[in-house]
């Protein structure tokens, strides 16, 4: 659409909300996916004489920290489920399609986690998938980025995925098959998990050294101040 929007109409057309949900309404924040929040908060503002547009947009960047921690917990769970558990098992039984889908879920969860760790108010949100890696690369190159190496490692996983998932027994130089690619992917996944744990420890969000990330979730959720059940895992 071209033409003039009222400020509230503009944000409502993207998010369904004229202004950001209240800080005390975590269930409303959790209904907004990150790509939607990215669309509402990205882009250059050319003129805002009253400051109202910027104020409204900033409200959508100000995700309550309890919500951010709840999402971090969810992402840790998916990284563990897809990348550390289902992926190696799918590869071991030769189910290339299941392995490929596990990689997809792992990459998305890890990408989201990087943005959440870097805090939406500072880093913004993980955007729509076609801009995902462009945004990750840009964030990773910023001077004070947290987990700056994850983007490159995720791209390595994606480059290796075809050989690992569908290479077969006689694939590759010397007929070594898919085993070398599988070993590399599993190694990268565990390396990313270890980096995440180090960052969680640095931020005093965990005292555990456990690198299977599902077991880090209770430590993260201990820092959620609200008792709202939508913020806690079952």
Which ranges hold each PLM region?
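Short, hydrophobic, well-ordered secondary-structure elements
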Residues: 76-84, 88, 92-118
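Amphipathic alpha-helix face/heptad-repeat signature
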Residues: 72-76, 102-103, 185-188, 192
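Amphipathic alpha-helical interaction surfaces
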Residues: 109-120, 160, 198, 202
């Amino acid at each position: 659409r071209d033409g003039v929007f009222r400020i509230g109409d503009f944000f409502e057309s993207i998010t369904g909300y004229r202004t950001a949900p209240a800080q005390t309404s975590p269930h409303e924040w959790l209904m907004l996916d990150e790509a939607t929040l990215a669309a509402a908060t990205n882009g250059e503002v050319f003129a805002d004489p009253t400051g109202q547009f910027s104020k409204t947009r900033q409200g959508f960047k100000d995700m309550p920290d309890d919500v951010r921690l709840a999402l971090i917990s969810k992402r840790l769970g998916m990284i563990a489920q897809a990348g550390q558990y289902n992926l190696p098992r799918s590869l071991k039984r030769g189910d290339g399609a299941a392995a490929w889908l596990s990689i997809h879920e792992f990459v998305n969860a890890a990408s989201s986690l990087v943005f959440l760790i870097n805090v939406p108010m500072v880093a913004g949100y993980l955007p729509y998938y076609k801009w995902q890696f462009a945004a990750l690369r840009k964030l990773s190159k910023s001077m004070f980025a947290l987990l700056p190496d994850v983007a490159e490692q995720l791209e390595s996983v994606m480059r290796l995925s075809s050989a690992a998932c569908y290479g077969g027994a006689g694939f590759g130089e010397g007929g070594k098959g898919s085993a070398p690619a599988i070993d590399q992917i599993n190694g990268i996944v565990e390396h990313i998990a270890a980096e995440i744990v180090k960052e969680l420890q640095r931020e005093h969000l965990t005292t555990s050294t456990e690198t299977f990330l599902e077991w880090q979730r209770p430590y993260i959720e201990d820092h959620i101040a609200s008792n709202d059940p939508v913020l806690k895992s079952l």
